[in-house]
Amino acid sequence: STVQTINREEHLKQFSKDYFDYIIIDETHRAGAKTYQRILDHFSPKFILGMTATPERTDGYDIFSLFNHNIAYEIRLQKAMKEDLLCPFHYFGVTDIKVNGEVLESASDFNHLVSEERINKIDEKIKFYGTDDNTLRGLIFCSKVDECKAISEALNKIGYKTRALSGDDSEEERANAINDIESDDPNKKIDYIITVNIFNEGIDIPRLNQVIMVRPTQSAIIFVQQLGRGLRKAERKEYLTVIDFIGNYQNNYLIPIALYGDTSYNKDTIRKLMASGSSLIPGSSTINFDKISKARIFESIDSSNLKLKKDLVQDYQLLKFKTGRIPSMVDFLDYGSRDPSLYVEYSKSYYNFVADQEEEYESKLNPSQSKLLEFFSMHINDGMRVEESIILERLIQQGFISYDDVKAIIRKNYGYEANDKTILSAVNGLNLKFVTEREGGNGKTLSINEKYGLRIVSESENKITIDSMLKDALTSTIFTKFLKDNTEYALKTFGNKFSADKFQDGFILYQKYSRKDVFRILNWEQNPNPQTVGGYFRSKDESNIAIFINYHKEEDISASTDYKDSFIDNTTFTWMTKSNRTLEAPEVRVIREYNGLRIPLFIKKSNAEGKDFYYMGEMEPITNSFRQKNMSSGDPVVQIDFNLNKPVEESLYNYITHDN
């Protein structure tokens, strides 16, 4: 019996509430509809089971509550592929046609979407990429019903057998089309079903061996649904071919999110996934992009705002439904949901965001407590350095911790030796003496500690204790709850990215750091003014010079700052000092002497990536490489070559050095 049939009043009356011991709901994400609700309200079974590939509804209905938030088993696309439950796929992201020199956009004119040029390109790619057995059994997904019909007519004219289907077609017509695409009878068989979204779910076409997408990706969930139509295993089916025509679409960043299954919406993570190619895809499946389509996706990642309030609220609500409670920052990590740091970036603290969503938390903290949570969230518990969070966790638990205990915890959990200088720097950070703010209108820069007169922790004789302001704040159970969660989030975040073989005295190779992060990890007493840092800055004690590189500079950059900084190869880097420097300049002298000097290298591909830089490793100057040069402006500059202490990993090296 179908849902539509049993939903009728005359049919429901035939069954008592306890007639069924077990009820199984397939495609249970639809259970929020009135038809399903009427059935579920009528029956009281001993056991109810829901099955769906996409439980994350975006209409605000809590599907999980129907099952008391009890998730018996969950398997996502990547895990199903790893377990060999699906057939492999080969994905090809190809550039859509250009109209008047411009790649198609979401709002492109209908005539361009069905132009002869576009039909010819679809035909070309069908023949080029083909299928596993050279027999076409494909689905083509379009963005509009009239586009489906026009593309179907055009492909039929050049020799294909296709059928356009929409919501107006009956179940019988859809079933006939499925039978025909699976048929071996040459008189019945069709090559393609062309549709918008009616085949996103609930259909079974095991022999389907090609999926073509000629529409922008509006949702990672829908992308996976459409991809999944062809992943069913079948006898003699070797793989699925996926051809995705990528235009200049705003949401192109959703493609790697869908393909790789990462829903953190962390831009750096998405870039790394794109750079990884097929290496992170289970089994024999592959992912390929042509040069232009790959550039379009990177541009979309750079330009998209991944912390819009509507998106943050949506993912917050989905996780709340899933867990059956207000989610914590750690829940976002444990469930593989949106990166909780995005909530901090948006609201200054996760508490602020929750208080905006939940009446029970509104105005529960006084301004001092709320401000302190903001400071910890933005400047301490960010997962960039672990020492502060270890100290804070123990202070919350017992009010004190010794230097030796900090060292023992780090030795046990991470296998490296912390030193007194770093622990003292962490205490300085916890007291918010490192981070600065401007005071009033005079522009004077003060540490946050000095500006607000904070007393957070005390340090004496290698013992750290809780001070008055933090002690008072911890009398609030809500403050304590959110600070504990924030601290646990920081410890987990650091632990998730920590790798002993990539850890180099505070930094983790190929992780991203802001300038503020860098100077904090280098144990500077106070964060320097960014305007004075520029491309590098040396410490007062001349123990380190951190170098920051914007690898692909803007075309309109001034001649006096157009520095020729670049990789010679993956182990050698050539670098220029600031202009108006000679071989006798102080920083050149310090680098030439290289007496215990630390020179960490930080690079971002371009300014479009934002303010953070990849840590590329430690550098050592090549003795005979110091040379006096002149900028194109005529200003003197010194160029120096360096050896990196480790070769840069291939995927990141290629990503940074290749211009989009």
Residue spans of the language-model regions?
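Conserved segment of the helicase C-terminal RecA-like domain
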Residues: 220-225, 229-260
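Conserved interdomain linker/interface between the two RecA-like ATPase lobes of SF2 helicase motors
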Residues: 71-142
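A short beta-strand element within the Helicase C-terminal
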Residues: 192-216, 222-225, 229, 240-244
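Long, largely alpha-helical accessory region at the distal end of helicase-like NTP-driven motors
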Residues: 127, 144, 258-391, 398-402, ...
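Post-DEXD/H (motif II) to motif III coupling segment of the RecA-like Helicase ATP-binding lobe
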Residues: 30-90
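Conserved helicase ATPase core of P-loop NTP-dependent helicases/translocases
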Residues: 11, 149-150, 160-199
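Acidic, glycine-rich low-complexity segments with interspersed aromatic residues
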Residues: 371-378, 384-395, 506-612
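Conserved helix/coil segment N-terminal to the catalytic DExD/H
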Residues: 1-22, 33-38
